Amino acid sequence: MNLSRLFKLGPLPSKNYVDYNLSAIICEDAANVFPVDKYLRETKISAELIGSRDIIKSLFPDIENRKNVKITESISQKDSILKLLETAKTQSDKHTVLSIPTSHLSILAAALPEEYSFTSVSIFTLPESERAVLLTDAFLDYQPTPATLAKLAENAHRIFKLFSDKKPKTAFLSANEKASEKVASTLSAQQAAELSRENMLAEGPLSFDLSLSPASADIKQYKGEIRGDADILVAPRRETASALYFSWKNFANLHPINITFINNTPLFYCDPSDSDISKLLSAEFAITSKVKGPLNKNDTNTQEA
């Protein structure tokens, strides 16, 4: 996948996507209506829209005239998620893409079978360097173990490999780059880095500025391998990731790709506050993505297979 082309906003959608299927949960906040509607109008993708029939018809006024779309009625958010997961299970060998509003993420994470863990990744391109940085966190797990953080990094690594062949530099974030018993997240970051597989260069704990600012690394005379050029950022907690995400999105005006996978099936999610560009980028990335090997599998073995 040519991510640089994608972020430079070539014509989207980029293909007709014949034989592809999009299964999307639609609700009142209309978070993902724009990209779903655009792909339905401009490609030959088939779609299953899950939710209240009345709400779907109000958001897609000509839905009854579209032959490539079916509506699956649901009675609640949880019911919608369960039906989406059933589609992911039965259509896993086909070109299937899933989509949900951000408001359904916590329900999705809670509804996943025990053998899966949940990893959401946001991909940003930094304006000065024009390179991609992946941001991930443990979401509902507010006290992630080092093993959990290492597993998040591995899942993010598999997404990174969709558009890059290089060995990614992974930073386990904390308040500073020195491990201390007084700051628990520094110890977790250190242990997570030690557990990480050899297919990435991992360091932790690492402060945010050392992870992304070469100038800060020079000023602080940091001697590590990651000197402002991290490819993957693993946040210690959900609050940290959320603060970074909204700072980049709202104050730096960046347009994130929001992606996860249910087994091998890509899922993009949208927030009502996301820009139309962000929503299109997320949809195109998901539709054109195909990972090798299971993603999100709850495997605590952190050695290279």
Per-region residue spans from a language model:
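Anion-binding alpha/beta catalytic cores of soluble intermediary-metabolism enzymes, centered on
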Residues: 2-226, 230-305
